[in-house]
From Swiss-Prot:
Tagged with keyword Mitochondrion: yes
UniProt GO BP: mitochondrial proton-transporting ATP synthase complex assembly
Native organism: Schizosaccharomyces pombe (strain 972 / ATCC 24843)
Full protein name: Inner membrane assembly complex subunit 17
Gene name, Swiss-Prot/TrEMBL: ina17
Mitochondrial intermembrane side: 63-112
Length: 112
């Protein structure tokens, strides 16, 4: 035979606590103007400051990227100018060398 265990479900129920109501009468403290200023304006000023900082840093990052790409383009153009001048100088040297070679060949071998 099974015996029933004594279980007290009253422990597990939620107790109702009476709600205390605030009384809006002359006993309530006066809030200082200093605190009221921050209560009224802290959130809007914070939002404006946050948006201003986000905009500033976002535009600064964009400027850094654009400046870096501009500097890279300037370096590439300078490098291209140097390469072209080098190739022109080497071409002139080669042609001068060939002309000199042809002249000396003509001097030593007039039959050609």
């Amino acid at each position: 035979m099974l015996r029933k265990l004594p279980i007290n479900f009253a422990k597990w129920t939620v107790k109702k606590v009476p709600v205390q109501q605030k009384r809006f009468n002359s006993q309530q403290k006066e809030i200082s103007p200093h605190i009221m200023f921050y209560k009224n304006y802290a959130r809007p000023l914070g939002k404006v400051t946050l948006f201003a900082l986000a905009t500033y840093y976002g535009l600064e990052i964009v400027w850094w990227k654009l400046d870096a790409s501009e500097q890279e383009a300037i370096k590439n153009s300078k490098l291209l100018i140097c390469e072209s001048s080098f190739s022109l100088l080497t071409f002139r040297r080669i042609t001068e060398f060939r002309e000199c070679e042809i002249k000396t060949r003509d001097l030593y071998d007039p039959e050609i």
